[in-house]
A protein has these predicted regions:
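Extracytosolic ligand-binding ectodomains
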Residues: 2-6, 16-27, 37-454
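N-terminal intrinsically disordered, low-complexity tails
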Residues: 11-13
Length: 454
């Protein structure tokens, strides 16, 4: 099934729910139409007479970047898996068997690091499942290692290639799930968000132009192309499509092109925070009357630390982070209490939720399967495919047969059936960004940037 068909099918009318009613019921749990939460595991264990996790340990793997450029995030992935396993074990484990997390370093990532790490987790540690954050550069090359072993693999690589690989051969790749929506959704998601601002009367676009600036990495290019290719459907035109050589600190030539034909929106899909901060520093002394949207980088503290007041007003989004609601904030608080004020629960949330819903699915399936135990792992995979899970990031429900998370509101109008595509704005660089969309999760309202003239 193509993205366009999926989008059309997934966005059929669904009942609207009030913020209060939705959030009140959100922590309930279920399979095949009822939302499941982590606490259901204790009930399952209790119904089986399990009082403690005292059986043979179940090795659960994490292939994470503990060294290299992504080590800061890798540390959070490791902490999250350890924390989730501790909580699962406190509820009796998986039918009385405790989880034992083990790790292999994916270093600088890329296929030459990722594939051996996955192989070691299977061959050396005998893991029953691998629950990762993101690893870049392998582009699904590790999937055959997983498929040959048949173990459950949940990752958060945010990669549309996953849809193609698993969707075309779901029998071979039955055990592989992407726990977040693909990067593609950042494109149509942004266009819908911009139109929603206009429909709500929060912003009146001065024209229909979007200037797109991208780096050369596939992640950035996929998002840029999605914005470009879908723009006309949402009533926009592309005034500039610029690919910059990265890393980049001198934005003068690109800014001149933008100033020569001022757009309503500047969308930068390059993501390195230091580079994006330099754009803000060089943009604000002579700004265009444009909203500025940037990819990923503004979520990192380095962006605000470098750009300071020049970052106020910048928009960004994420398809995967803990929410600022009752459930999300409870996790955020507990995570920082455990690992320190500088820890990042927004990054950790992806592994935390996935480890919990894996444990729940395995318990419902009657237990886990080690490498080579295909029949049992197929039972676990079937439970994952049917599951609707409400965690700290919102709802996880998978596209079938692609086995990738469905985004809300990009592909479904029902917040109980999709992971929220969160839009945030830096309104004061000295504080945390404001969550301004989507409903019913927003905690603040959009504000016009300080450089903008209404």
């Amino acid at each position: 099934m193509t993205i366009s068909k999926k989008q059309s099918a997934a966005t059929e009318t669904a009942s609207r729910v009030s913020r209060r009613g939705f959030l009140k019921g959100a922590s309930l749990a279920g399979v095949g139409g009822v939302a499941l939460g982590a606490g259901m595991l204790a009930d399952i264990n209790g119904s089986r007479g399990v009082k403690a996790a005292e059986g043979e340990p179940i090795p659960i793997g994490g292939g994470v970047p503990l060294t290299g450029w992504a080590a800061a995030d890798g540390i959070e992935f490791k902490r999250a898996l350890e924390m989730a396993c501790e909580e699962v074990n406190a509820m009796g484990g998986i039918l009385g068997r405790p989880l034992a997390p083990v790790f292999e370093d994916t270093k600088e990532q890329g296929a030459d690091n990722i594939m051996p790490a996955m192989q070691r987790l299977i061959d050396r540690h005998g893991v029953h499942a691998i629950v990762n954050g993101y690893n870049t550069g392998a582009v699904t090359q590790e999937y055959d290692i997983i498929a040959d072993a048949g173990v459950i693999y949940i990752h958060h690589n945010t990669d549309i290639v996953h849809h193609d690989t698993v969707g075309k051969d779901p029998e071979r790749y039955f055990s592989i799930f992407m726990g977040d929506p693909a990067e593609y959704w950042y494109g149509p998601g942004l266009l819908k968000f911009l139109n929603d601002l206009g429909e709500k009367g929060q912003w009146a676009r001065p024209n229909n132009k979007i200037a797109i600036v991208t780096g050369s990495q596939n992640y950035s290019v996929v998002i840029a192309n999605a914005i470009r290719d879908k723009a006309a459907e949402y009533g926009w035109e592309i005034s500039l499509y610029e690919t910059v050589v990265v890393p980049i600190s001198e934005w003068g030539p690109t800014l001149q092109k933008i100033r020569n034909d001022p757009p309503a929106v500047i969308a930068i899909t390059h993501w390195v925070p230091q580079d994006l901060a330099q754009f803000c520093i060089q943009f604000t002394p002579n700004p265009t009357n444009s909203l500025v949207y940037m990819q990923y980088g503004p979520s990192l503290a380095a962006f605000r630390e470098i750009g300071k007041e020049n970052t106020n007003g910048v928009l960004y989004s994420t398809v995967i982070a803990s929410l600022q609601d009752e459930i999300g904030n409870d996790f955020n608080t507990r995570y920082k209490a455990k690992f320190g004020a500088s820890a990042s629960p927004l990054v950790a949330a992806q592994v935390y939720d996935s480890a919990h819903y894996y444990a729940l699915a395995a318990a419902l399936a009657g237990g886990t399967g080690e490498p080579g135990e295909f029949e049992q792992n197929k039972k676990v995979a079937d439970r994952l495919r049917r599951m609707i899970y409400r965690g700290v990031m919102g709802t996880t429900k998978f596209f079938i047969p692609e086995q990738a998370s469905i985004p809300y509101p990009d592909a479904t109008k029902d917040p109980s059936l999709g992971m929220p595509h969160q839009y945030l704005q830096i309104q004061d660089y000295t504080t945390e960004p404001a969550l301004i969309a989507p409903a019913p999760y927003e905690t603040s309202q959009f504000a016009l940037p300080p450089w903008y003239k209404a």
